[in-house]
Every structure is written in structure tokens, then in C-alpha cells.
């Protein structure tokens, strides 16, 4: 019997996949537990509509992330560290970078920065994962105060 999975099942497949299982397993477990629905013309149409909506949402998310990437990469972030002759005091953390970016809008979280950084004096590139397919390379300049 062919069924459409309504949720991810480790041994069978992912949500919205069409799989072929035995009739008893489908009727007695998957359908009864609401983990799948039987494949019919109507359920196939509903699945196709849902997949089209998900694809459109994914494309919109990629477009939004690309626009945000362009905005972030336009201007570098400038930070200043206190120093005395040879010694710097502190470094620039991910939290400071996120706070600076989020002054205008809240759209970057600490989990979006791919590698943890403690930036000293100099020019640095910080990668920010905006979407699983879009990564922004933010230019950060740290100089002496």
C-alpha cells in the first residue's frame, strides 16, 4: 500500500514522502497513529499543493536572506579597543558584533555566526549563516582607541 508520510519516521522516510509499505503496517499503525495517509488522487493533489507552497516559501526565504546579505556586506563594522603601548585590553566578541548589527532590526542570533570569534586589532571576515544556502561575509575592522 502506498502512503504519504505526515511526519519524519527514521526507518521509513521524511515528511511528505510517498512510500510503499505492507497493507497491515499502513492500516494498523501508520494511518491509525496519524503518521501517514493513504495515497489517493485527492491526497496526491493536497500533497502537490503543500509542496508548491513550501517551495514558494523556501524561495522567498532565500530571496530575503540574499537581500539581507547584500545589505550586511555593503559597509564594514568598526570597533575600537583600548590599548596601552604594547598591550590590548579585551577583544571583540560575537555578542558585540550581533548587538551592533541588531541596532536597526532584530534579525541576527548568536547561532547564525558559524565560528566563534574573539577578534583582536586588525581586519577580520566573519561569516553569518542567514539561510542554509546563503552565507554573508561581514567585514569587521578593529582598531586602537
Curated annotation (Swiss-Prot):
Gene Ontology CC annotations of this record: ribonucleoprotein complex; ribosome
HAMAP family, A to Z: Ribosomal_bL9
Organism the protein comes from: Ureaplasma parvum serovar 3 (strain ATCC 700970)
SUPFAM superfamilies (alphabetical): L9 N-domain-like (SSF55658), Ribosomal protein L9 C-domain (SSF55653)
Similarity section: Belongs to the bacterial ribosomal protein bL9 family.
GO biological process: translation
Name listed for the protein in its UniProt record: Large ribosomal subunit protein bL9
GO molecular function: rRNA binding; structural constituent of ribosome
InterPro entries: Ribosomal_bL9, Ribosomal_bL9/RNase_H1_N, Ribosomal_bL9_bac/chp, Ribosomal_bL9_C, Ribosomal_bL9_C_sf, Ribosomal_bL9_N, Ribosomal_bL9_N_sf
Function: Binds to the 23S rRNA.
Keywords: Ribonucleoprotein, Ribosomal protein, RNA-binding, rRNA-binding
Family annotation (PANTHER family): 50S RIBOSOMAL PROTEIN L9
Amino acid at each position: 500500500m502506498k502512503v504519504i508520510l505526515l511526519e519524519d519516521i527514521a526507518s521509513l522516510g521524511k515528511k511528505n514522502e510517498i512510500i510503499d509499505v505492507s497493507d497491515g503496517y499502513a492500516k494498523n499503525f501508520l494511518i491509525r497513529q496519524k503518521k501517514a495517509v493513504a495515497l489517493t488522487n485527492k491526497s496526491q493533489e493536497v500533497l502537490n499543493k503543500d509542496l508548491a507552497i513550501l517551495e514558494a516559501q523556501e524561495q522567498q526565504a532565500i530571496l530575503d536572506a540574499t537581500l539581507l546579505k547584500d545589505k550586511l556586506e555593503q559597509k564594514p563594522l568598526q570597533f575600537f579597543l583600548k590599548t596601552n603601548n604594547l598591550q590590548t585590553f579585551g577583544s571583540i566578541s560575537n555578542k558585540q558584533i550581533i548587538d551592533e548589527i541588531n541596532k536597526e532590526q532584530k534579525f541576527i542570533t548568536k547561532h547564525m555566526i558559524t565560528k566563534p570569534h574573539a577578534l583582536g586589532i586588525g581586519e577580520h571576515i566573519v561569516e553569518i549563516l542567514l539561510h542554509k544556502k546563503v552565507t554573508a561575509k561581514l567585514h569587521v575592522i578593529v582598531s586602537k582607541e
